[in-house]
Design a protein with these regions (language model features):
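A contiguous loop/helix-start segment that scaffolds small-molecule binding in enzyme catalytic cores
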Residues: 1-6, 20, 69-70, 138-223
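Short, hinge-like loop/turn segments at secondary-structure boundaries
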Residues: 49-50, 113-117, 186-189
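Glycine-rich, charge-decorated loop segments at or immediately adjacent to ligand/cofactor-binding or catalytic sites
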Residues: 106-114, 179-183
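Short, glycine-/small-residue-rich phosphate/pyrophosphate-handling segment
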Residues: 109-140, 147
């Protein structure tokens, strides 16, 4: 039986999980997660450990726990820009059970009515805002995993600077939870106060005649 359980959890906490996922958590001897994740857990005799930083410390700890029933709590889908990728590099998949919850991408597409295949996914977690530039094409639909509560304003400013000030921005906070909130606006006139640090941004790109388009692919333009 795999000793390492990786369970994706959403804003509803245990209430949003399957019976199998709840059992994997409740029967673990050690539960590791972010402060937000652990705050959703009931008080039990289990050892609760807050995710250390950097991630290498967590991987070293998990090596010490090898063979002990250990559950790592992740946000949404652990394999979608989550901890799952690092864990799969560190441990054989046969030693793990990974149970995802809906990802921020899935939830955002459901809220917006956008098919996954029509959407570009960009994460700003620990990445420069400038990476978004290469995705800015007229009528593109982009889901952005925010870095923090300031990301919506920073994205709106970048869009405006790049000539895409007409773009529609929708900020989705706490999707699936009781505090879920949706904020909509236009990039060039965005003046919303920072909200929840945990948010996802859905963008529909609209250009103007003077917009200069960029590409992610290097090279010269055709004559």
């Amino acid at each position: 039986t795999p000793w390492l359980r990786v369970v994706g959890i959403g804003d509803r906490g245990l209430d949003g999980l399957s019976k199998e996922a709840r059992e994997l958590i409740s029967t673990a001897e050690i539960v590791i997660g972010g402060k937000r994740h652990l705050s959703l857990m009931p008080k039990t005799a289990q050892e609760h450990i807050v995710w250390p930083s950097p991630i290498s410390i967590l991987l070293n700890k998990l090596t010490e726990f090898r063979g002990t029933k250990t559950c790592v709590l992740a946000t949404g889908d652990p394999m979608c820009y989550g901890i799952g990728a690092s864990l799969c590099k560190a441990f054989p998949i046969k030693e793990m059970i990974i149970l995802p919850s809906p990802s921020a991408l899935s939830l955002a597409c459901a809220r917006m009515g956008w098919p996954h295949q029509d959407v570009e996914l960009v994460t700003l977690h620990g990445r420069p805002l400038a990476i978004l530039r290469g995705y800015l094409q007229p009528l593109a639909k982009i889901v952005v995993l925010s870095n923090d509560e300031n990301s919506p304003r920073e994205v709106a400013e970048l869009l405006t600077e790049q000539g895409f000030g007409n773009s529609q921005i929708t900020v989705l906070e706490h999707m699936g939870g009781s505090s879920e909130r949706r904020i909509e606006g236009i990039a060039r006139s965005w003046n919303e106060k920072p909200g929840a640090s945990f948010n996802t941004i859905a963008i529909e790109i609209f250009s103007s005649p003077e917009t200069v388009l960029m590409t992610r692919h290097p090279g010269l333009e055709d004559d």
